[in-house]
A protein has these predicted regions:
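Beta-rich carbohydrate-recognition and catalytic domains
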Residues: 1-117
Length: 117
């Protein structure tokens, strides 16, 4: 028995509903939504997690380099120095890396409409 009742006018947002905010990335999940009212509109603040598009046989993930630029690291899945046992964190050659880059993105909706950027 499902005791949760979803208000039918509230949308279910999927990663495919939004455009990636970072060139060359894909949105893999939408997390931790928070709703607020501002200027007569309903706002939604989402945590958006993006990663590089994956290639067959490789694991790729974004990092910020020393120049504060996003850089993509990519390794063969069969590399003995790679530990990908946790899908959130990649360990390579003793160094831990997050598999996605997350940021906050606001969306808004006017009464009765869907959310927009």
């Amino acid at each position: 028995m499902d005791i949760a009742k979803r208000f039918p006018e509230n949308p279910i947002l999927r990663p495919s509903d939004l455009r990636p905010g970072i060139d060359g990335m894909e949105i893999v999940c939408l997390l931790n939504p928070g709703v607020f009212r501002l200027g007569g509109r309903t706002g939604l603040l989402l945590r958006v997690a993006e990663r590089p598009r994956q290639e067959e046989g490789r694991i790729s993930f974004p990092i910020y380099n020393d120049r504060d630029e996003i850089e993509v690291l990519s390794f063969d899945k069969d590399d003995s120095r790679l530990d990908a046992s946790d899908p959130r964190v990649i360990k390579y050659n003793g160094q831990n890396y997050l598999t996605t880059l997350s940021y906050l993105r606001p969306l808004f909706r006017d009464d009765g409409g869907g959310f927009f950027e």
